[in-house]
UniProtKB/Swiss-Prot annotation:
UniProt catalytic activity: a primary methyl amine + O2 + H2O = an aldehyde + H2O2 + NH4(+)
Organism, scientific name: Arabidopsis thaliana
Protein name, entry field: Amine oxidase [copper-containing] alpha 2, peroxisomal
Gene, per the UniProt record: CuAOalpha2
Name of a matching Pfam family: Cu_amine_oxidN3
Modification after translation: Topaquinone (TPQ) is generated by copper-dependent autoxidation of a specific tyrosyl residue.
């Protein structure tokens, strides 16, 4: 009888936590509830009429960052019996063509701060105004005439929005470009672009202010672009066996509101319309000290820079700052149980206001689950003891918090993985659909140009070269807020002639503690060094400073020249690692106003002050980079490409923190079969 082994892991039932159901007093980092968002709208509506006939729109609404000292005082108090910090909302709105910043206090139910933004750049685009802009284009007569002139069916045309960037203009208006695509037998929208049109929409006036048609070559065909399993035809494959996920005692983690407790970890997870998934107040329990110790005060996506490498008119402006322009929370999607997240996952909803301030919910926008991947936590076989052979192995398990944000054609998987050993892994997965351009070629032998700026991935279709730079903001509090950044260089030494050895060389370490921000800017790969955030006021019993080490993934750095306009706006990618002193206003690496920004309010600009960072409350910024030269395997959808980094305890514990972890049982069961099978 043929048998299939199904691995039993964990599960009781899928359950969902709705952020609108929590009862005050909330955790200081809880996302704004539906009730609070309605209150924000009502309070603002008393001062600024809101509605279809008024030019007042909500571009961003989120929790106004409470004072860190108050949060830590509340968090460290026994049973959280200290009054939590004042709860406030931060609002960016458009008001008659201006960007207005408003702070609302919930205890007084009043506006406590109100000012007009006077610098460069615009706030995040809303979904509503992007949809309105594309609707305007689809009714614009010159556009419709161009579509008909091409012999295309207007009803099969889809128009998408694209930011315009900045290319040296002294003043910029709130314009976007729109890009048309043709369906006509395909639902893979982004693989059939209609090129040769420049269509500019003024968002404040909601009208087309620029249109030009330069009719260009053939359109990619619709065939070969299907990706829905229900529409694909046999043969199917490769064949994968099913797995059963079962946990009779329920999941190993507990969720109290937005606070997650699992194994030796405790942390808070929430949702922000710009950042998406936010992890706060992550602490790990130290068995030797019998208490929780701080690791991460707050960590989240800060920005994603995605420049494309075609300098021609249809492409040069595509240099997205995804979080700042489109909102990585606003574009987050509902996760599919059993596929986006395994059956042992718990889910949380996300709530944010629409353009008119009305709350909108994304169901199942975040998930959390225990991950059993067959990895080994630690092991050792001892065969040198006479008469004994000892083998000790511990299977590994970790806890993963995940979200997916779909920004146009790309789906980004963002996850934080907590390990019992004390490590936190931050991961970024890239999948979705290529952004392509039509060409007359179907084979490389036909190419006439010096550069097609990409790869032929299908008939008449080039996948355009591009980059992804994903920047995380990590406010590390390693066993407290007084931290330093240590760069330990691995230096090759010649063996002294005075040493009686055949060895000619060895390496040793040279420790450098960064004094100011300039000392802490790191381009990975230039030299062998270890990067550690330490607490110089806390030491192990052997005298080592407690710390957490950065373990980078494969590093990529920008290849654009530094005076290129997209790179000026994204100068925060010039280094893989930055360290800055904590400043609650320095949250977004591209600046608070990223759309059409000019690079004058970015992480790179803040860091030019070269502030002191030794033995201070410091923040680490880390950029995960990808250079993407498309290939045929990326068509019609892309297998996930994964990158990331790890924060790993280094002299944080007195010994291996999982030494005494007991093995857990994993088992398999045979497949039930009939006699005739």
């Amino acid at each position: 009888m043929a048998q299939v082994h199904l691995t039993i892991f964990i599960f009781s039932s899928i359950f969902v936590i709705s952020s609108s159901s929590f009862i005050p007093p909330p955790h200081p980092f809880d996302p704004l509830t539906e009730t609070e968002l309605k209150l924000v709208r009502n309070i603002i509506n008393k001062s600024y009429p809101i509605g279809h006939n008024h030019k007042f729109t909500f571009q961003y609404v989120g929790l106004n960052e409470p004072e860190k000292s108050l949060v830590l005082s509340w968090h460290s108090s026994p049973d959280r019996n200290v009054k939590p910090p004042p709860r406030q909302a931060f609002v960016i709105a458009r008001d008659k063509g201006m960007s207005r910043e408003i702070v609302i206090d919930f205890s007084t139910r009043a506006i406590v701060s109100n000012k007009i933004h006077v610098g460069n750049g615009n706030p995040m685009l809303t979904i509503d105004e992007q949809q309105a802009a594309t609707a305007v284009v689809q009714k614009y007569k010159p556009f419709c005439d161009s579509i008909i002139k091409r012999g295309l069916n207007l009803s099969e045309v889809v128009v998408t929005s694209s930011t315009m960037g900045w290319f040296g203009e002294t003043k910029t208006k709130r314009f976007i470009r729109t890009i048309p695509f043709y369906l006509n037998g395909s639902v893979n929208t982004y693989l059939r672009p209609i090129e040769g049109m420049t269509i500019i929409v003024n968002l404040d006036q909601m009208k087309v202010t620029g249109f030009k048609d330069r009719f260009t070559g053939p359109m990619p065909k619709a065939n070969g672009r299907e990706y829905r399993i229900s529409k694909l035809k046999p043969p199917f494959g490769p064949s994968l066996r099913s797995a059963v996920v079962f946990q009779p005692d329920g999941p190993g983690f507990k969720i109290d509101g937005h606070v997650v407790r699992w194994a030796n970890w405790e942390f808070h997870m929430s949702f922000d319309v710009r950042a998406g998934l936010v992890i706060s107040l992550a602490s790990i329990f130290d068995m030797d000290m019998n208490r929780y110790r701080q690791v991460l005060y707050k960590g989240h996506l800060s920005e994603m820079f995605v420049p494309y490498m075609d300098p021609n008119d249809d492409w040069y402006f595509i240099s997205y700052l995804d979080c700042g322009e489109f909102g990585c929370g606003q574009t987050a999607v509902s996760l599919e149980p059993y596929t986006d997240c395994p059956p042992n996952a718990a889910f949380m909803d996300g709530i944010f206001p629409g353009q008119d301030g009305t709350p909108t919910k994304i169901s199942n926008v975040m998930c959390i689950f225990e991950k059993y991947a067959g990895d080994i936590m630690w092991r050792h076989t001892e065969a040198e003891v006479p008469g004994l052979k000892i083998t000790e192995v511990r299977p590994d398990v970790s806890l993963v918090a995940r979200m997916v944000t779909t920004v146009g054609n790309y789906d980004y998987i963002i996850e934080y993985e907590f390990k019992p050993s004390g490590s936190i892994k931050m991961g970024v997965g890239l999948t979705g659909v290529l952004e392509v351009k039509p060409v007359e070629y179907v084979h490389t032998s036909e190419i006439k140009e010096d550069d097609i700026y990409g790869t032929i991935v299908a008939d008449n279709t080039v996948g355009v070269n591009h980059d992804h730079f994903v920047t995380f903001r990590l406010d590390l509090d390693i066993d407290g807020t007084e931290n330093s950044f240590v760069r330990t260089e691995l230096v090759t030494k010649r063996t002294p002639k005075s040493v009686n050895t055949p060895r000619k060389s060895y390496w040793t370490t040279k420790r450098n503690t960064a004094k100011t921000e300039a000392d802490a800017r790191v381009k990975l790969g230039l030299r062998a060094e270890e990067l550690v955030v330490v607490n110089p006021t806390k030491k192990t019993k052997h005298g080592n400073e407690v710390g957490y080490r950065l373990l980078p993934g494969p590093a990529s750095s920008p290849l654009l020249v530094q005076d290129d306009y997209p790179q000026i706006r994204a100068a925060f990618t010039n280094y893989n690692v930055w360290i800055t002193p904590y400043n609650k206003s320095e949250v977004w690496a591209s600046g608070l106003y990223a759309d059409r920004s000019q690079g004058d309010d970015t992480l790179a600009v803040w860091s030019q002050r070269d502030r002191e960072i030794e033995n201070k409350d410091i923040v680490m910024w880390y950029t995960v980079g990808f250079h993407h030269v498309p290939c045929q395997e990326d068509f019609p959808t892309m297998p996930t490409m994964f990158g990331g980094f790890e924060l790993r305890p280094t002299n944080f514990f007195e010994q291996n923190p999982v030494l005494k972890a007991k093995p857990f049982n994993l088992t398999t069961i045979p497949k039930c079969t009939t006699k005739n099978e």
